[in-house]
Amino acid sequence: MVVRVELDAIDMKILRELQDDGRITNVELAERVGISAPPCLRRVRKLEEAGVIRGYRALLNASALGYDLVAFCMVGLKHQSDANLKAFAARTASWPLVREAWMVSGESDFLLQCVAENLASFQDFVIEELTATENVDTVRTMLTIRQVKDACQVEI
């Protein structure tokens, strides 16, 4: 479990700026939040060490790279012991098509977001990998029509 970190107004400004532009220089960041560069860098490092900032990455356009299909899979397991849940969660890490995997409550045990080149490659994954996985009982899929919101930022 993640421990909540006490953040002051400057920390919040730093986080807002970094969410908007993760490639900003420390000097520019310090200027925008109203402090000098050395304490700004110390604050950023502290936020990284505390796990508030998990990393920095480029947001890629999947369609531009040939991945035209986004689908969700709702997966139910036959047995939900802690070991079985952990085993399936670990298995999801080995599937390149799975972009995100969530353990959920309700009718399914896991929700997977998948990105594939096309319907055929997604079907191959579902049939040859997902449903063939030990302890998988049910798989329901939903193909997306269009994305209407893509907010990767946390509201702060």
Curated annotation (Swiss-Prot):
Transmembrane segments: none annotated. GO terms for biological process: response to amino acid. Residues 26-45 bind DNA. GO terms for molecular function: sequence-specific DNA binding. It comes from the Bacteria. PROSITE patterns: HTH_ASNC_1 (PS00519), HTH_ASNC_2 (PS50956). One of its GO terms (cellular component) is cytosol. Residues 7-68 form the HTH asnC-type domain. The keyword rRNA-binding does not apply. SUPFAM superfamilies: Dimeric alpha+beta barrel, Winged helix' DNA-binding domain. It holds the Pfam family HTH_24. Keywords: Activator, DNA-binding, Transcription, Transcription regulation. Mediates a global response to leucine. Exogenous leucine affects the expression of a number of different operons; lrp mediates this effect for at least some of these operons. Homodimer. This is Leucine-responsive regulatory protein. It comes from Rhizobium meliloti (strain 1021) (Ensifer meliloti). The lineage of its organism: Bacteria, Pseudomonadati, Pseudomonadota, Alphaproteobacteria, Hyphomicrobiales.
